[in-house]
Amino acid sequence: MANIFEVPNPGNDLLEKADKVRLASIKISQTENIDRIKALNFMADCLEKNSKEILEANSADYSSAEKKGISRALLSRLKLSKAKLNSGIEGVRKVGELADPVNQIQIKRELSNGLILERKTVPIGVLGVIFESRPDAVMQISSLAIRSGNGVILKGGSEANLTNTSIVKALQEGLDESGLDKNAICLLTSRKDSMAMLNLEKYINLIIPRGSNELVKFIQENTRIPVLGHADGICHLFIDIEANLEMALSVALDSKIQYPAACNAIETLLVHKDIAPAFLEKAIPLFNSNDVKLIGDRKSVELGLEHEASAEDWQTEYLDLILSIKIVDDLDEAIIHIQKYSSKHTDGIITENLKTANRFMNVVDSAGVFHNCSTRFADGFRYGFGAEVGISTQTLPPRGPVGLEGLVTYKYFLKGDGNIVDDFSLGKAIYTHKDL
């Protein structure tokens, strides 16, 4: 890994930029809800005003990327059509319609007469976001950061530098026109700076990587800054003996082909041995007709699959039209397989037996456990979060798709009237611990 990525110490220029964002984030954290909504609307207006320049920059990025032979998948994510840009601009406005995540009272409690405790949500501070070639992510992430009262340092893929620069220029213009500090949004354009970000623990409070598995793992292992993200998306779907066959086929197909490059697409299908013959009889031609390469264990090969799986396949995130199939004896074997190979992202079961479903969902330790539905629903927008900054597969919160609520933390506010602990020790005062 060391020969691919290095973590250099930040130079003076980067330190200066980071400090400007830090100072701007302090100002933004003190703003009222109405001011942040106003800022988002100004940001959207400036994006509209600069649409022509943004699209021209994207066209230049796209042409350059094509000449360099960048993959079709990356080119697709890089392309910013007028419709996609307009959708992104509308998304910025819609973030302003979401409930304010800041200053929400989670606990209000009288500890004693005249001694009141509150726990309230507060902005995290400065977000460091390293993402792939999608320029629309700049609009989404920046709007979420401002809405939650945070500053943000962005580093996109070099293939989108012109587009990202043009978008950030418009966003900063909008912030400035709204009366907020434009330094709350900062874009880095060099690979060296993106790696040096990992050593900015005095300035950045949370790193959010949105890129390849290799990059995410490297970041998790090489920074002292907390990281919100997931390296792998190895998702499973278990077809139980009591599954509705037509439902199982429909959900399995959607979970794989609706968008195979997504982290919530399934990579392994587990099938109960007693339903396997009937299921595979229909599933094999169905998946074949949708250009899905099926790789299976010996039992599934005996039932018609052409390619036998290796041990490596069970722990591979294909992000492609490839699906591993394993036939299991029962629910217990399915759970054991999932617990061994799952990345704890999203795993599902298809069954008409509610008791079986509940056991599966209670035992499988993933951020999302689904019953009778596609794993592709594991998404912040589909959950009704309005927008998603990333997905976390860690056990501690935030977990799963992370929206605005994952971009705030909390602190305790204790207000008294000269209260001292010694009075309680001497019996002069008593704790009431009464929720208000």
From Swiss-Prot:
The keyword Cell wall biogenesis/degradation does not apply. Pathway: Amino-acid biosynthesis; L-proline biosynthesis; L-glutamate 5-semialdehyde from L-glutamate: step 2/2. InterPro entries: Ald_DH/histidinol_DH, Ald_DH_C, Ald_DH_N, Aldehyde_DH_dom, G-glutamylP_reductase_CS, Glu-5-SA_DH, GPR_dom. CDD domains: ALDH_F18-19_ProA-GPR. PROSITE patterns: PROA. GO terms for molecular function: glutamate-5-semialdehyde dehydrogenase activity; NADP binding. GO terms for cellular component: cytoplasm. GO terms for biological process: L-proline biosynthetic process. Its EC number is 1.2.1.41. It comes from the Bacteria. It catalyses: L-glutamate 5-semialdehyde + phosphate + NADP(+) = L-glutamyl 5-phosphate + NADPH + H(+). Gene3D superfamilies: Aldehyde Dehydrogenase, Chain A, domain 1, Aldehyde Dehydrogenase, Chain A, domain 2. Keywords: Amino-acid biosynthesis, Cytoplasm, NADP, Oxidoreductase, Proline biosynthesis. It is found in: Cytoplasm. Belongs to the gamma-glutamyl phosphate reductase family. Catalyzes the NADPH-dependent reduction of L-glutamate 5-phosphate into L-glutamate 5-semialdehyde and phosphate. The product spontaneously undergoes cyclization to form 1-pyrroline-5-carboxylate. This is Gamma-glutamyl phosphate reductase. It comes from Prochlorococcus marinus (strain MIT 9301).
